[in-house]
Every structure is written in C-alpha cells, then in structure tokens.
A protein has these predicted regions:
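Structural microenvironment flanking redox-active thiols in thiol-disulfide oxidoreductases
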Residues: 454-495, 509-513
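Short, internal strand/loop/helix patches
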Residues: 490-526, 530
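Short active-site neighborhood of thiol/selenol oxidoreductases, capturing the structured segment around
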Residues: 432-462, 475
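Non-catalytic, surface beta->alpha helical segment in thiol-disulfide oxidoreductase systems
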Residues: 521-524, 530-555
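Oxidative protein folding and maturation machinery
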Residues: 131-440
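Bacterial Sec-dependent N-terminal signal peptides
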Residues: 1-34, 555
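Loop/turn elements at helix/coil->beta-strand transitions in domains of secreted/extracellular proteins
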Residues: 439-443, 472-475, 497-501, 530
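A non-transmembrane, solvent-exposed segment enriched in polar/low-complexity residues
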Residues: 27-195
Length: 555
C-alpha cells in the first residue's frame, strides 16, 4: 500500500561527515490580505437549493498543488451568499462552484460580487456577471473561457513529447510556449485584451510550460535544466499571480529536485547538525552525554568512540529525532543541487507535504523546527495557513484520545454520531461486527488509510455524501489502517468528524477485507445488504456521489 514513510538514518553514517553549521534564514514579515466574495443567484428554485444549499469558493495554496482550499457560503432564501477568504499573493485564481456550474476568476484584496440567474444557468455559455475588484478583467475572462472551451485543441501529451524530442531545453520551452498559447493568441486577433488579464493568462502559460519541462527533465535525468533555461522562465520569484499552474510547476520542481538526489539515499548529515538537534530537542541526557554533545555541536570531529552514545540517544528518542533527521538530511543534499530560492520552497514544501501524514505532536515539532528556516514571506504565510488547518481541531483530537485509546472490540462513541472501534477480527467475522452495529441498515464500507492522500480525499468526500443523504437508512463504515500509527488514524477521524462507525485494523486484517471486496487498490468501497451480504463489492467511491446515490436508490 503506498504511503509516505520516514527512513531511520543509521547513526554510523553521521560520523562520515565533518561539522557544518546551520544558519537560520532571515525573513521578513508579511500579512495576508483578504477578499470578500458575495453575490446572488436570482430566481433560485427549491429544487436547485436542495441540490446545492451552498456555493463554494476555493483557492490554491502554492505548497499543495493537489488541494483546493474551499470555503462554503450558505445560500440565503433570496439566493444571496457571502464569504471572506485570505489572500497570500497580490492576485490569486479563485473558483466559484454551484452544483454543476463553475468558473475561475481573478481575486485581489477588496470585494468581488458575482451575479447569476437560475433561469439561464444551463442556457447561457457565460451566466456570470462580475462587479467590484477586477470586474472588467473577470467579465472578459469569462468570455475568453467560453472561447477557449470551444476552440482549444484536446491536449495530446504524446504529440507534444514528439515535438520536443531531441531538442534543447530552451528550444523545448519556446515550442511548448507556442503550443500552449495558441488559443489565446487566436482570441487576441479579434479582441482587445485588458493588460492585467494578459499578464494573468501568460503567467499561467509560463508555469504550464515549466511543469512540462520539469517532468521531461526528471524522466530524462537531465541535471542541467535550470542551467540551460533561466530560472526566471521556470519559477520566477516575483510573479504577482498564484494559479493552479504555478502550484503545479513548483510541485514538479520538487519532484525534479528529489530525482537529482536519489543516489544520496542512506547518506547521513554532519555530526554537528545531529548534535545540535539533540541539544535542542532532547532533555534527558546524562552529564557525560551532554558534555560530549556540547563538544560535537561546537565543531569537534566525531570518533568511533562516540558511536555507542549516539546510537543510544537515537534509539531512546527515535520518534522525535527520526523526523528531524529526515528533514535535515534531505536539505543537506538538496542544498548542493538547487539555488537558495528553490531551497526555500523545498523547505516549506517538505513540511506541507508531510503535515497530513504525521501525528499532531510531530506536526508541532516539525513546524517549530522548519518555519524559522523559511525566508520567503509568501511561503511562510502559505505554510502557516496549512499548519493552522491541520491543528485547528487539536482540542477535539485530545478529547477523542481521552475517550478512546486501547479498547479492543469495544465500540466507543467519541463525538456525536462518530463511533470508534479497534477490531481484532478478520474477513467475514469483521463484516459480522459491522452488521451488529448496523442493526438492520444497509452498510456502505470505505476502506482507506490516512497514509495515502487519495484515501484522505475520499474520507472528506464521504462526509459530503452523508450530508446529501441526510437521515437515510444506511450505516457508513470506515475501515482504516496506518503504517504510521493508530494515533494518526484516530486524529484523522477526529478532524474529519464523518458520522458512522470508524474501525481500525492492522494491515493483515485490512488485506483480508480488501480480498473480500475484490479490490487491489486503496481506497476501495463496497455495499452490504441488511443481512450483511455483499450487494456490490466494487462499489463507487464517495468522490462519485451520483453513482453512489444511484446504487443506493436501487436498493
């Protein structure tokens, strides 16, 4: 099962390196702006309201390309809505969603109003009318999106690859730019484009090209991409716009950088860095250990006689030191292959990537360690936002931990409608446990893991699906396992608060259930009848709510 794991670094490898000090990057302070998005859906019908009682405004975070940060805005009886979102960059690409209707728009600090008419939602190509900040730009953007939808050729990655095959990186950049900007240039032939919209669209194209080049360089093991193509054409630091293309390009950059240090796996960090970590985070050292650590952190070279002491310290505090060592080791290797601005992003990206896969106590530890090293104020604000989202439920997490810790085969309601169960059963006996809790209801089972991003997204989708179903006669059972810890699973449940039965099993139990579900991937879903028998083994996942609802209606 795919998961992100920490590698424990052999202590002896630490002694292969001389001391190298670590300086904290000086950073400036920057406060986020905000934008208020309001509007009204005229002639809103009861049917439309029941289908979608909220509109959703979402935005990107430059450190997590695959995640949209969504803010629901409840619809008032007259169809009006209002929501305020933070902004990290001067201009950010936001997304409006209402049922099956969506559009992108450009936001900056201030107020933006969006007007729609329910009578023409599915009749007009451009049912949106903007006013307020960037009104002219967004109205023109809406019209351009209609043109783009009708005229943009279907993307063909293989054809693009053939066009740049054997070409230099700079030639490839020019070829790709021409390919990606063709539709926009065609639109410009008959329309006068506002300067801000022109900058915004060209910024997106630049990063779309950069993402392709980073992917190509990773596949071809090209270590000279950022030498042959100016970094200003790949990831300019002073760009005013935050778009999904920019976040994606930087994500590809992180993968490219990781590919360049793949042969460094197993190598450690300077012994002085290790000593500094011990000095900062470990308190229960003996006088002898403390004295030697003080010597090592001030530049003394480690010797073979230090080996047993370092091993003992690491073994006693592996849960704390292992995560810090992974970070420091990775940065020490990356520092040799990327520039300082790139390293700044990679520091922030490391934490942003790992936050969802580690427990609360380790989230706090890594945040306190890494945040002071991040210099770019936009990365700092982006990281702060993601961290706050992860720890905002800490009180709930602690309350759940107080109620549920070591119970086996004893269901415990930890929150209203949220029951936790640690099971020792396998296969059919595990399903019998679900049936006992269902008490004659249908049972929708989601097999998932907090270690895997796709699973975490399905858990979120399941909660939204439950809200659509209301009080329907069905029990949601979430069967989870984690190669990290039971605590990570429990904390993920506490954050999500999806109602139903949450069951933790070990990996061999999990595999026995997956075999019964006849699935070879995680996450997976199945539907059980009131008698506990399989109705649909390979059921649609919660992220396909229409298919799930159709299946339930048939039963």
């Amino acid at each position: 099962m795919p998961t992100l794991r920490y590698k424990i670094i052999p202590v002896f490898s630490l002694l292969l390196f001389l001391f190298s000090g670590q300086l904290l990057v000086a950073y400036g302070q920057l406060k986020s702006d905000s934008v208020t998005v309001s509007g009204r859906i005229k002639n809103l019908t009861i049917q439309l309201y029941r289908q979608s009682p909220n509109v959703t405004i979402s935005r990107n975070n430059i450190l997590q390309a695959s995640r949209e940060l969504a803010r629901p805005a409840p619809l008032e009886p007259d169809g009006s809505f209002k929501v305020t979102l933070p902004l990290v960059y001067p201009y950010e690409e936001l997304y409006f969603n209402f049922g099956q209707i969506s559009t992108a728009f450009l936001a900056s600090a201030g107020t933006i109003e969006i007007a729609l008419d329910a009578d023409s939602l599915f009749l007009s190509d451009a049912p949106f009318r903007f006013s307020g900040a960037n009104a002219q730009v967004n109205n023109q953007l809406t019209r351009y999106k209609v043109f783009e939808f009708k005229n943009k050729p279907k993307a063909d990655g293989r054809q693009l690859t053939r066009k740049v095959e054997g070409r230099s990186a700079e030639d490839s950049r020019k070829i790709l730019t021409n390919e990606f900007i063709t539709t926009y240039e065609k639109y410009r032939e008959t329309h006068e484009i506002l300067p801000l919209l022109d900058q915004y669209i060209k910024s997106g194209v630049k990063y779309e090209v950069a993402a392709f080049l980073y992917d190509k360089a990773s596949a071809e093991q090209d270590t000279r991409l950022e030498t042959n193509v100016p970094i200003s054409n790949l990831r300019p630091a002073n760009d005013l716009f935050l778009t999904v293309q920019r976040a994606t390009a930087l994500e590809r950059f992180s993968l490219y950088a990781a590919s360049r240090i793949a042969d460094q796996d197993g190598r450690g960090i300077p012994v002085g860095t290790f000593a500094n970590l011990v000095d900062r985070y470990i308190r229960d050292l003996s006088e002898t250990e403390r004295a030697r650590i003080n010597e090592l952190k001030t530049g003394r070279t480690g010797t073979n006689r230090d080996m047993p002491m370092l091993q003992r310290i690491l073994q006693r505090h592996q849960d704390t030191l292992a995560k810090l060592l992974v970070y420091e080791t990775r940065m020490s290797h990356l520092r040799k292959v990327v520039d300082t601005t790139g390293l700044d992003y990679l520091k922030a990206n490391f934490l942003a990537t790992n936050l969802p896969t580690i427990e609360l106590k380790n989230q706090e530890l890594l945040y306190q360690h890494i945040m002071p090293q991040v210099g770019d104020p936009h990365y700092r604000l982006s990281l702060e936002e993601l961290y706050r989202l992860e720890v905002k439920d800490s009180a709930t997490i602690n309350a759940v931990a107080a109620k549920f810790s070591k119970q086996i085969n004893q269901p415990v309601e930890v929150l209203s409608g949220v029951t936790l169960l640690r099971s020792s059963r396998y296969g059919k006996e595990l399903i019998e446990q679900f049936q006992a809790q269902a008490q004659g209801r249908l049972i929708y089972v989601l097999a998932w893991s907090p270690d895997v991003e796709a699973s975490r997204l399905e858990l979120q989708a399941a909660r939204a699906l439950q809200e659509q179903l209301g009080s329907r006669d069905i029990l949601f059972v979430y069967v989870g396992t984690s190669e990290t810890s039971t605590e990570l699973w429990r904390e993920s449940v506490a954050k999500n608060k999806a109602k139903g039965l949450h069951v933790f099993v070990e990996t061999d139990q999990f595999d026995s259930l997956i075999a019964l579900m006849r699935s070879d991937v995680v996450p997976a879903a199945t539907l059980l009848g009131r008698d506990g028998k399989f109705i649909k083994r390979d059921a649609p996942l919660p992220s396909k709510p229409d298919e799930v609802l159709k299946l339930l209606r048939e039963k």
